[in-house]
């Protein structure tokens, strides 16, 4: 999993790694 710091503000699910941040 990617680090939470790489998550975009608002948790935009545009990237495959962002889905893990939500």
UniProtKB/Swiss-Prot annotation:
Placement of covalent cross-link S-(2-aminovinyl)-D-cysteine (Ser-Cys): 19-22
Family matches, as InterPro entries: Lantibiotic_typ-A_Bacillales
Signal peptide (UniProt feature, chain positions): none
A Pfam family that the UniProt record links to this protein: Gallidermin
GO molecular function: signaling receptor binding
Modified positions (2,3-didehydroalanine (Ser)) in chain numbering: 5
Gene Ontology, cellular component aspect: extracellular region
Domain of life: Bacteria
Protein modification: Maturation of lantibiotics involves the enzymatic conversion of Thr, and Ser into dehydrated AA and the formation of thioether bonds with cysteine. The C-terminal lanthionine undergoes decarboxylation. This is followed by membrane translocation and cleavage of the modified precursor.
Gene Ontology biological-process entries: defense response to bacterium; killing of cells of another organism
2,3-didehydrobutyrine PTM positions: 14
Keywords noted in UniProt: Antibiotic, Antimicrobial, Bacteriocin, D-amino acid, Lantibiotic, Plasmid, Thioether bond
Function comment: Lanthionine-containing peptide antibiotic (lantibiotic) active on Gram-positive bacteria. The bactericidal activity of lantibiotics is based on depolarization of energized bacterial cytoplasmic membranes, initiated by the formation of aqueous transmembrane pores.
UniProt-listed NCBIfam families: lantibio_gallid
Family named by the database record: Belongs to the type A lantibiotic family.
Protein known as: Lantibiotic mutacin B-Ny266
């Amino acid at each position: 999993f990617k680090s939470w710091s790489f998550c975009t503000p608002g948790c935009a699910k545009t990237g495959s790694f962002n889905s893990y941040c939500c």
